[in-house]
Regions:
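Short solvent-exposed loop/turn micro-motifs enriched in small/polar/acidic residues
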Residues: 1-3, 55-57, 84-86
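Active-site environment of divalent metal-dependent phosphoester hydrolases
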Residues: 25-27, 52-65, 79-82
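Active-site neighborhood of phospho(di)ester-bond hydrolases with catalytic His/Asp-centered motifs
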Residues: 19-20, 51-57, 71-75
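Conserved catalytic scaffold of divalent metal-dependent phosphoesterases
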Residues: 1-52
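N-terminal start-of-chain detector that recognizes signal peptides
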Residues: 25-26, 42-46, 62-66, 72-74
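Short, acidic/polar N-cap/turn motifs at the starts of alpha helices
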Residues: 5-9, 60-61, 88-90
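Acidic, His/Gly-rich catalytic cores of divalent-metal-dependent hydrolytic chemistry
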Residues: 64-117
Length: 117
C-alpha cells in the first residue's frame, strides 16, 4: 500500500474517474453523507473535471448520483481491533451506466441489503 499514489486519475468505459483515500485535496478527511449536499458533490466533480469520484477514509458506504456524475465510497472490509465502526462492505461500480451494487459481508448470501440513495 505504501507504494500506491495518494490520488489517481484515469478513465474507464469512456468515463473520467478520480480516486483518492479521503476527499480531493485532503486524504485525512472523508465525505460523510450528513455533511455534504448534492450541490457540493456536483461542484467537486466539476472542479475535478471528472464524471466519477471514488473515495474512502470513512469506512462507510456512500453512493450519490448528481447532475455531473456520481460519488462513491464502497465502505470497508477491514475490521478494527477497537471501537471504531466499519461497514464490512465492498461495492461494484458499473460504467458507463454508473450503477453501484453494494455487498455486505455480514448479510447472508442471497439476501439483499438496502440500496444507497
Amino acid at each position: 500500500l505504501r507504494d500506491l499514489p495518494l490520488e489517481w486519475r484515469g478513465s474507464f468505459a469512456g468515463m473520467s474517474v478520480f480516486m483518492c483515500h479521503g476527499k480531493p485535496g485532503n486524504n485525512l478527511w472523508g465525505l460523510y453523507r450528513d455533511h455534504i449536499s448534492n450541490t457540493l458533490l456536483d461542484m467537486m466533480l466539476v472542479s475535478l473535471g471528472v464524471d466519477v469520484l471514488i473515495t474512502g477514509h470513512t469506512h462507510m458506504p456512500l453512493y450519490v448520483r448528481v447532475r455531473r456524475g456520481c460519488v462513491v465510497n464502497p465502505g470497508s472490509l477491514y475490521t478494527f481491533h477497537n471501537v471504531r465502526v466499519t461497514s464490512h462492505t465492498y461495492g461494484v461500480l458499473s460504467l458507463p451506466d454508473m450503477t453501484f451494487e453494494l455487498y455486505d459481508l455480514t448479510v447472508p448470501v442471497g439476501e439483499r441489503i438496502l440500496p444507497l440513495t
